[in-house]
């Protein structure tokens, strides 16, 4: 009998963790997780203890022999791990709220993974994940790193280009959400639907859609023009598309494309929300407070349905399916973030792309799509340039590189506004950006 798997989740005190635990419980027969180590930082210790105790109740109720370990010692947890998943947030939700509110002051989209907010989440996150990568290299060099931390594309880009790890996969729930949305719009079972995904994280397109192997792209594009088929996420306003624009685009956009193709409407929605219910981070803080109160209930031993309000639908499906496919060498097709290696012709070979891959025990094998359609190619290339420059800024702490990244992002209207936002956000996040400030003060 083979020994069970050791999985380490960094950011284990996350409100999403019960969904991950549920995923491992459901798949125990094909994915024998023996140890699940939930790791967090001292500021997250209370949440870690609450969610970890719930996780223990869940595995006990399910009758599966998964040992749950809770720790603040990352290195202790990582020793001899088989898989490491990352789902942490540097600066917690308070930092996200600043990422959302500060750009709005300048009339710019304030969002977790797009525009200035996405840049600053990357600047805070990348140095931390590169330190984690060094620990993995030393303590569990054969482990797969499965990154869920946003901005997942930029973070995967940095891991591929600035760490020595080769076993790296970036993961997102957006493609699964699109697939579910397509099935709902067509009123069919999701297992009958396949989508040809290609692009970048939160910048992924469905180049074609198949129902029972037959293309139904035109039918899906027609359905997306109907407001009842918004196909968006909890965290993104479902502003209505112009049906003629979708037909001209001739691919399936994801919810995040509204920030680029409907910037005016999305900005208006954000400004209004910031004056009423609050920014998305502020809404999530309230949702999380409610969730952790539920998690404390000693009689709760399942994932509560209220977790779906948090916006991470299908998170565990994406993560557990990926880990199971690598472990079992399934050779099934999943959309993940991985090194391009020519899969998308107009993106550098050494960059991270989000594309359908055949999942094997040696990792994802991207399915080449050639060039992206001219209708979306330029935007994808522009965002990839932004991600590459942003990753460089995160690693070097160079002010001018950060200003370049901010300015070339298509959601930022001028170099002057870029500098104003950059300066204010650098100061606001100073505690989490030592690479910029230690240099200045040295």
Swiss-Prot record:
Residues in coiled coil: none
Signal sequence coordinates: none
PROSITE patterns on file: GLYCOSYL_HYDROL_F4 (PS01324)
Name of this protein: Probable 6-phospho-beta-glucosidase
Positions annotated to bind Mn(2+): 172, 202
Annotated gene: licH
First-level EC class: hydrolase
Binding site for substrate: 96, 150
């Amino acid at each position: 009998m083979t020994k069970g798997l050791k999985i380490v989740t960094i950011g284990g005190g996350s409100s999403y963790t019960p969904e991950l635990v549920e995923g491992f419980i459901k798949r125990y027969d094909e994915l024998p997780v023996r140890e699940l180590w939930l790791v967090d930082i001292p500021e997250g210790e209370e949440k870690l203890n609450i969610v970890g105790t719930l996780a223990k109740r869940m595995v006990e109720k399910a009758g599966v022999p998964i040992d749950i370990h809770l720790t603040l010692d990352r290195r202790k947890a990582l020793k001899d791990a088989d898989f490491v998943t990352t789902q942490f947030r540097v600066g917690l939700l308070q930092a996200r709220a600043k990422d959302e509110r500060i750009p709005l002051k300048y009339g710019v989209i304030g969002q977790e993974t797009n525009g200035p907010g996405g840049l600053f989440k990357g600047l805070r996150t990348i140095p931390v994940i590169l330190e984690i990568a060094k620990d993995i290299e030393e303590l569990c060099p054969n482990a797969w790193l499965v990154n869920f931390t946003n901005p997942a594309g930029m973070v995967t880009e940095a891991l591929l280009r600035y760490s020595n790890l080769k076993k790296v996969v970036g993961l997102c729930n957006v493609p699964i959400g699109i697939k579910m949305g397509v099935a709902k719009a067509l009123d069919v079972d999701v297992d009958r639907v396949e989508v040809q995904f290609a692009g970048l994280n939160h910048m992924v397109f469905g180049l074609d859609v198949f129902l029972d192997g037959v293309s139904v792209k035109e039918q899906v594009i027609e359905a997306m023009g109907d407001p009842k088929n918004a196909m968006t996420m909890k965290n993104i306003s479902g502003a209505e598309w112009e049906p003629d624009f979708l037909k001209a685009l001739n691919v399936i956009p994801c919810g995040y494309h509204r920030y680029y193709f409907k910037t005016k409407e999305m900005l208006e929605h954000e400004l209004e929300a910031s004056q009423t219910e609050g920014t998305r981070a502020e809404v999530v803080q309230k949702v999380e407070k409610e969730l952790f109160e539920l998690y404390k209930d000693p009689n709760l031993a399942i994932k509560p349905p209220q977790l779906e309000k948090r916006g991470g639908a299908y998170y565990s499906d994406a993560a557990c399916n990926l880990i199971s496919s690598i472990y079992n060498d399934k050779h099934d097709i999943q959309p993940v973030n991985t090194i391009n290696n020519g899969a998308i012709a107009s993106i550098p070979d050494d960059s991270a792309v989000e594309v359908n891959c055949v999942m094997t025990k040696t990792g994802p094998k991207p399915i080449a799509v050639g060039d992206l359609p001219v209708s979306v190619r330029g935007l994808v290339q522009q965002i990839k340039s932004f991600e590459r420059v942003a990753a460089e800024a995160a690693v070097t702490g160079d002010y001018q590189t950060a200003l370049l990244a901010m300015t070339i992002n298509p959601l930022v209207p001028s170099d002057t506004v870029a500098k104003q936002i950059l300066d204010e956000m650098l100061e606001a996040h100073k505690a989490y950006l030592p690479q910029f400030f230690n240099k200045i003060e040295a």
